[in-house]
A protein has these predicted regions:
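ATP-binding N-terminal substructure of ATP-dependent carboxylate-amine bond-forming enzymes
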Residues: 1-80, 87-96
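Active-site nucleotide/adenylate-binding loops and adjacent lid/helix of ATP-dependent enzymes
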Residues: 55-56, 66-195
Length: 195
């Protein structure tokens, strides 16, 4: 019987997921979306129509939004729900980064992630200073990245929240619980046998 990760709800036996689309390849998932966007642009005779998806974000939040700006917009109330973080720019000296980490109360292990990115690309666990130096050396010279306290729990929840302009309350339209599979070996059996 599958066992849920600590802090996550129990895994249902034989219950199909409500949606499996999140795990499709990006090109397959987004192709119909882009076709629909193009059709709407033609129908409404506006190439800028997609930018209205979220008018408070650059490009409507479709691409290129900076995580650091989104984090900062949460204010003092919302930021308490986030793991502590700092923004690192390419011009920051290692001593300045170390000082910023100390000022923010951060210590290894950390998570490094691009300030602009999606779907986990460029996200690395950083366990020590050497790994941070390596991450920085392999990161594009012109891009900022975020160092954030590592949340050491199994599983992850993805929440899709929608609030229409002018409304005080929004709605959660999608909730995805992700469990990361793992296998404990016995020293002799193959992976296939263990599964």
């Amino acid at each position: 019987r599958p066992v849920a990760a600590a802090g996550m709800p129990p895994i249902g036996q034989g219950e199909p997921p409500l949606s499996f689309f999140e795990f499709w390849p990006a090109w397959l998932f987004y192709t119909p979306v882009w076709i629909w966007i193009v059709l709407l642009m033609l129908w409404h005779r506006s190439i800028r129509l997609p930018l209205l998806a979220n008018p408070t974000l650059p490009a409507g939040g479709l691409v290129g939004e900076e995580k650091s700006r989104l984090f900062a917009r949460l204010g003092s109330t919302g930021s308490g729900c986030l793991p502590e973080w700092i923004l690192v720019s390419p011009s920051d000296e290692p001593a300045d980064v170390a000082r910023s980490l100390e000022d923010a109360g951060l210590a290894f292990p950390l998570v490094a992630k691009p300030d602009i990115g999606c779907r986990g690309a460029g996200v690395w666990p950083i366990r020590n200073g050497e790994e941070l130096v390596r991450y920085r050396s392999e990161f594009p010279d012109s891009c900022n990245f975020i160092l954030q306290r590592m949340v050491d729990v199994e599983g992850e929840a993805g929440v899709f929240f929608v609030r229409a302009p002018g409304e005080c309350r929004g709605t959660i339209v999608s909730l995805t619980l992700k469990y990361f599979p793992h296998v404990v070996g016995n020293g002799t059996a193959t992976l296939r046998e263990l599964i």
